[in-house]
């Protein structure tokens, strides 16, 4: 975020924030406390009105929560960044046109979209990631998909959009070694994209 934005005020959209938006809270705390930035987050998910009310109590005016459908009402670019963290595979990678429409909406309202998701390399790695996903979402009402992207299918997806890839990291170490096969950094990737003019 700091690499691509030198402004003091930063507006961030988080797509698919979930009910325990830890990533949002961590990013907010780092940018505000360590880097002294003025940060506002708008978090979107399939929240009920009651969920929105309860979540909005947590951080007062700095982090706001909204129902996903309201993104369509945003008419012009409003955000410096969009985070879409471990969300796309839950939509279902076979729903390619739907995912393209979502990413087009996000690149329309955000200068830069930060995508973090999972890569599989075959049957075994796909099922390891499914197991990890099941454990990670056990207490949430989130489906575990059957399939995850591989490098080729994700590259093909982006190739069908009018976007520029600013940066990509195809292997990220996120988990400690004692998790053995689940700590494989090749299971996680990041892409930063922006709309091509």
Predicted features along the sequence, with ranges:
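Class I (Rossmann-like) S-adenosyl-L-methionine-dependent methyltransferase catalytic domain
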Residues: 1-5, 9-62, 67-73, 97, ...
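Alpha-helical scaffold elements within enzyme catalytic domains, especially in hydrolases
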Residues: 105-106, 157
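Alpha/beta-hydrolase fold active-site loops
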Residues: 79
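A conserved beta-strand element that flanks and buttresses the S-adenosyl-L-methionine
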Residues: 83
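A short, conserved alpha-helix within the catalytic core of class I
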Residues: 91-105
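Short glycine-dipeptide loop
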Residues: 108-113
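Short catalytic micro-motifs in class I SAM-dependent methyltransferases
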Residues: 86-90
